[in-house]
């Protein structure tokens, strides 16, 4: 009985690992030039707020993928998904999750 339970949970863990490896994340995409320019602008901020500015730009890029109306600069930060979603955008885990929430 204990071996069966252990094997069952091991199989479930392997399935979860395989599923997470197959999903496409925003960090897996090549950074577009417009996003790199935004990061360069954030680099020019004063040292006390530089890291905060970079984190905001990075977070906005990820959050713009499923929601292009989030901030006015979404088309600059996430050109893969804004203003028109390209096929690669529909493969992103964050976009798939948002689409599931909208449907259900």
From Swiss-Prot:
Contains 3 disulfide bonds. Its main location: secreted. It is found in: Secreted. Keywords: Disulfide bond, Secreted, Signal, Toxin. The keyword Phosphoprotein does not apply. GO terms for molecular function: toxin activity. Belongs to the scoloptoxin-10 family. This is U-scoloptoxin(10)-Cw1a. It comes from Cormocephalus westwoodi (Westwood's green centipede). The lineage of its organism: Eukaryota, Metazoa, Ecdysozoa, Arthropoda, Myriapoda.
């Amino acid at each position: 009985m204990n071996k069966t339970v252990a094997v069952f949970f091991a199989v479930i863990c392997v399935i979860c690992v395989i599923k997470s490896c197959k999903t496409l994340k925003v960090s897996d995409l090549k950074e577009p030039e417009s996003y790199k320019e935004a990061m360069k602008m954030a680099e020019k901020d004063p040292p006390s707020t530089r890291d905060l500015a970079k984190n905001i730009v990075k977070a906005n890029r990820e959050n713009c993928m499923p929601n292009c109306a989030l901030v006015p600069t979404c088309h600059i930060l996430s050109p893969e998904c804004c203003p028109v979603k390209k096929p690669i955008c529909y493969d992103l885990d964050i976009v798939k999750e948002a689409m599931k929430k909208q449907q259900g």
